């Protein structure tokens, strides 16, 4: 198991790098190896000069020939040993180079300590929440320090391991002298290090690729920075092992912040994704440098991270091959045809720290993408002007998006493969059908009558919802899944098809309602025998009261009441900042986005397409329906979360 530096705070990683003697001892060792190499070269030249002088002089015959052969072997021994010493010096300098790079990339411990001291000071004086924005900013900076140190340590480990693989004991070097010529050609000189080391390591990995094991890097979703053992087990059993048998799955830390959804005072989505991408790319290269193949599992936010890392690796100077790297993604916001980030390309909300990145690349590395129908994050309607469909998708972010790990293997095996891809692709797309509309889940929670009423309206409501995806029969877009598809205005569906679907839905709804009503299970009346006894003398005797115990109880009650009031106040005013940020986005970014869409439509019309005028008006309206509905859902989620926290705080003091 390779070390996971990402689980260590910057206080630990920074202290490790900056403590100790630094690179001076390794530089001294490199100089010593250089001196030894120079002495061995001089000895070889001197011995060769002496023996050749004897041969060209008066010493002739068989004895002279035997001496020449023996001398040649010894000269070869000296020369090869000198080459070994030069190689050791080069490796020592390569280690120094790797260390210096890590040192430069690591946050200085004094900066980390100053950050923590500032946070402690602000928290101590944060009586009315006035310091909350400053605390959040410092915590965000601390998260950046964490990611920076983790990436630096991971890179240091990869580089140091590459150097260590080339080192061998002096005795082993001496024993290998008969084949010194080929060995000398493989050793990098001091001028070539550390790139010579990297090339040598990569050559060794390529030669042993057939024997490489596959390591699965499992990342959590938003709010799950460190996946639990159960999470890793389910990710492997349900999604990874089917396509990569024998994978060795292990958790990978990524920040997974999502202000203000996960925690109000939390890392923003953009910062979290950026840090996670650095960590994932470093972990992938670390495993590949160790001779392993890698398969990556990403869920929700970590699917976005995976999408970015795919593109970064493929565009790098030393990209992994498709045989070395693969991906499995679930609940992917960057789904080419359905991901919410792809439906609204390029939109950015600076106040919330959220930016829509591009679609997941489909032809870079072998990838499987699983999406649950009506998951509003990965399966957003193509035609958001359909308010019912958009509202259902927003409900799906709450009721469906978290269901990927409660599915059974049979449900996943029954997933619908989307095979109508365009052009060459390495990605396989799967849709897992959803029986019930998320929009009706609140109605289903009503006792007794909830399910019958939901089943009465669901067939027709599903037709309307599905029209938001383009086909009344499917709750997902049926156009090519590997083509990035932004939102549109109206689906091209015949009114006759819609009418037929509504007629069939009405019949099905009435039938389902009648069946449910005829099979209602009414709650039984309470059994009187279960009522508590009120007979005199029953129950536990009440201990006698004393003045001391009464005062102690009053002190405890006073302290608990004050703490609860403080917690309730903190939770209440903490919701003000995200509410203000949402309002900021709604009042600034959304109008700007509308103007952008309007101008695109006008440009389309000026180029001769009359639909541009329709789009100039319709696209802003469609975007507003989706964005304002999402903003309302987000605000409602924040209020519900705060309400639960307040209720729990109050219930703690109520007997």
Curated annotation (Swiss-Prot):
GO terms for biological process: response to host immune response. InterPro entries: AB_hydrolase_fold, PE-PPE_C, PPE_dom, PPE_sf. It comes from the Bacteria. Residues 245-469 form the PE-PPE domain. PANTHER family: GLUTAMINE-RICH PROTEIN 2. Belongs to the mycobacterial PPE family. This is Uncharacterized PPE family protein PPE28. It comes from Mycobacterium tuberculosis (strain ATCC 25618 / H37Rv).
């Amino acid at each position: 198991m390779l070390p996971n530096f990402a689980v260590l705070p910057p206080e630990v990683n920074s202290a490790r790098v900056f403590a100790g003697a630094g690179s001076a001892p390794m530089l001294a060792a490199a100089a010593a190896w250089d001196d030894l190499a120079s002495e061995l070269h001089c000895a070889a030249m001197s011995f060769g000069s002496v023996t050749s002088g004897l041969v060209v002089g008066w010493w002739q015959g068989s004895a002279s020939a035997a001496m020449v052969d023996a001398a040649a072997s010894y000269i070869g021994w000296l020369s090869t040993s000198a080459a070994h010493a030069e190689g050791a010096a080069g490796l020592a300098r390569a280690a120094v180079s790797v260390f210096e790079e890590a040192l430069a990339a690591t946050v200085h411990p004094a900066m980390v300590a100053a950050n923590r001291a500032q946070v402690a000071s602000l928290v101590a004086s944060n009586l009315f929440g006035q310091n909350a924005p400053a605390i959040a900013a410092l915590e965000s900076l601390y998260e950046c320090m964490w990611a920076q140190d983790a990436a630096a340590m991971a890179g240091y480990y990869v580089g140091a391991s590459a150097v260590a693989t080339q080192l061998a004991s002096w005795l082993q070097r001496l024993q290998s002298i008969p084949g010194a010529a080929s060995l000398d050609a493989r050793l990098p000189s001091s001028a070539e290090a550390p790139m010579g080391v990297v090339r040598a390591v990569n050559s060794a990995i390529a030669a042993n690729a057939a024997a490489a094991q596959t390591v699965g890097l499992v990342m959590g979703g938003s709010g799950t920075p460190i996946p639990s053992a159960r999470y890793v087990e389910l990710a492997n059993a349900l999604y990874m092992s089917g396509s990569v048998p024998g994978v060795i799955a292990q958790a990978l830390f990524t920040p997974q912040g999502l202000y203000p959804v996960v925690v109000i005072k939390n890392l923003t989505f953009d910062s979290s994704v950026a840090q996670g991408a650095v960590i994932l790319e470093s972990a992938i290269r670390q495993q590949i440098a160790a001779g392993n193949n890698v398969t990556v599992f990403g869920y929700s936010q970590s699917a976005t991270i995976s999408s970015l890392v795919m593109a970064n690796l493929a565009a790098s100077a030393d990209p992994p091959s498709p045989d070395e790297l693969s991906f499995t993604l679930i609940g992917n916001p960057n789904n080419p045809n359905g991901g919410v980030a792809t439906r609204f390309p390029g939109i950015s909300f600076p106040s919330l720290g959220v930016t829509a990145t591009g679609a997941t690349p489909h032809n870079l590395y072998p990838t499987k993408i699983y999406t649950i129908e009506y998951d509003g994050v990965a399966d957003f309607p193509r035609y958001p002007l359909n308010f019912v469909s958009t509202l259902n998708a927003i409900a799906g972010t709450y009721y469906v998006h978290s269901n990927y790990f409660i599915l059974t293997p049979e449900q996943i095996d029954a997933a619908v493969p989307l095979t109508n891809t365009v052009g060459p692709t390495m990605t396989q797309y799967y849709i897992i059908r959803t029986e019930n509309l998320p929009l009706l889940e609140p109605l289903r929670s009503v006792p007794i009558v909830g399910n019958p009423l939901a089943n009465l309206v669901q067939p027709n409501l599903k037709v309307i919802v599905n029209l938001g995806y383009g086909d009344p029969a499917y709750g997902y877009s049926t156009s090519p899944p590997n083509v990035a598809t932004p939102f549109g205005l109206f689906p091209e569906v015949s009114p006759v098809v819609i009418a037929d679907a509504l007629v069939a839905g009405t019949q099905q709804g009435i039938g389902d309602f009648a069946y449910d009503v005829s099979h209602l299970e009414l709650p039984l009346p309470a059994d009187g025998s279960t009522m508590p006894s009120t007979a005199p003398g029953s129950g536990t005797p009440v201990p006698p009261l004393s003045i001391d115990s009464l005062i102690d109880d009053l002190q405890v009650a006073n302290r608990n009441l004050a703490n609860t009031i403080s917690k309730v106040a903190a939770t209440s005013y903490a919701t003000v900042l995200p509410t203000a940020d949402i309002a900021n986005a709604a009042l600034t970014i959304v109008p700007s986005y509308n103007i952008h869409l309007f101008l695109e439509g006008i440009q389309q019309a000026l180029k001769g397409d009359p639909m541009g005028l329709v789009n100039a008006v319709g696209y802003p309206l469609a975007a507003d329906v989706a964005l304002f509905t999402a903003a309302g859902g987000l605000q409602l989620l924040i209020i519900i979360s705060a309400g639960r926290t307040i209720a729990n705080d109050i219930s703690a003091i109520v007997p």
